[in-house]
């Protein structure tokens, strides 16, 4: 597999993470190991007003296929600079929530090029993504152990734990909503639809609020069902399309009132525009931000490869809309 986020995995700088603590009593950034999971450390960013006692919301930020936790830290920054105020972790620090950047599984000669087992994988559907999926890595189990470890070290509001991610990380967010709904409050998936349902059954224990973000000009996870047309490798098997994923969630959430569409302001004039589609009559919020002309990138995020490879990066909005959706949800 030629990793989509190769440049992210090999670039610097990264967050300056300090040593892990048995119990965090104040703000900061630290790298910790997950017990029982070799070589799958995570970075935890706690907000400046964290006091070790008052529980804070937590966003789980999952890297794309071929990336890692450091790559995820840069993906959400407009210029890829982790000190920039545009980054997800900077937004978190300004708004009083924590961010968790975990590692998927690496293999072979390039172990820092990691993937998540987001599901799929048979004679008809792509395995998302790579060897983590092909080898059946128990990433749902990993996330459970990861959350156990974080909750044991820091004061986390367990009614407000969210998952987000790009591409393979977005698809993994969908899988967590299907299989870990007792712990994941809501998800915001970017550029990665629910591949898990192509070979597995999505049966959440509770209605999970879902936001899905996707560009209509995404060559790496095409908006319509199809095979990728960018350096991700893996043959000709397709990714699931966005319409199927949204229809499935609408059925699972009992949405029976139709949809409402709203055009968001075109402030950047970057060749992309965004339409917010909201399903009504649902047991939990369901929204889709359809980025007309948008590529395989985090909104107002890092253009980690050239536009001819991943398509345009939308600049009209960014982490604030993702947090607006997630932060409004509670178990």
Language-model features: where?
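Extracellular secreted precursors and ectodomains with disulfide-bonded cysteine-rich loops/domains
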Residues: 8, 18-19, 30, 75, ...
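Acidic glycine-/aspartate-rich tracts in secreted/extracellular proteins
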Residues: 49-50, 65-67, 105-109, 217-219, ...
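Extracellular low-complexity, Gly/Ser/Thr-rich intrinsically disordered linkers
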Residues: 141-142, 285-331
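The feature captures the conserved acid-bearing segment of alpha/beta-hydrolase catalytic domains
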Residues: 185-283, 293, 320
């Amino acid at each position: 597999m030629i990793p989509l986020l190769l440049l992210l995995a090999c670039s610097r700088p990264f967050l300056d993470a300090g040593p892990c603590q048995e119990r965090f009593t104040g703000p900061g950034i630290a790298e910790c190991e997950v017990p029982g999971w070799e070589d799958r450390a995570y970075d935890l960013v706690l907000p400046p007003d964290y006091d070790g006692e008052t529980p804070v919301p937590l966003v789980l930020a999952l890297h794309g296929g071929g990336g890692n936790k450091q790559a995820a830290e840069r993906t959400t920054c407009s210029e890829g600079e982790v000190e920039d105020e545009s980054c997800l972790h900077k937004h978190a620090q300004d708004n009083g929530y924590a961010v968790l950047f975990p590692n998927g599984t690496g293999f072979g000669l390039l172990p820092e090029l990691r993937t998540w087992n987001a599901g799929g994988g048979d004679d008809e559907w792509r395995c998302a993504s790579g060897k983590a999926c092909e080898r059946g890595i128990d990433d749902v189990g990993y996330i459970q152990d990861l959350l156990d470890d974080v909750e044991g070290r820091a004061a986390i509001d367990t009614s407000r734990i969210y998952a987000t991610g790009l591409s393979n990380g977005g698809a993994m967010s969908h899988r967590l909503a299907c299989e870990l709904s007792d712990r994941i409050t809501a998800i915001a998936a970017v550029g990665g639809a629910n591949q898990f349902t192509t070979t597995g059954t999505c049966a959440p224990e509770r209605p999970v609020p879902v936001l899905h973000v996707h560009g209509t000009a995404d060559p790496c996870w095409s908006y319509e069902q199809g095979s990728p047309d960018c350096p991700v490798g893996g043959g000709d098997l397709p990714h699931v399309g966005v319409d199927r994923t949204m229809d499935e969630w609408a059925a699972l959430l009992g949405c029976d009132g139709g949809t409402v569409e709203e055009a968001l302001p075109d402030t950047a004039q970057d060749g992309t525009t965004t339409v917010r589609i909201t399903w009504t009559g649902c047991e939990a919020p369901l929204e889709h931000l359809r980025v007309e002309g948008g590529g395989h990138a985090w909104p107002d995020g890092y253009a980690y490869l050239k536009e001819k490879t991943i398509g345009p990066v939308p600049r009209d909005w960014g982490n604030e809309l993702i947090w607006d959706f997630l932060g409004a949800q509670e178990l």
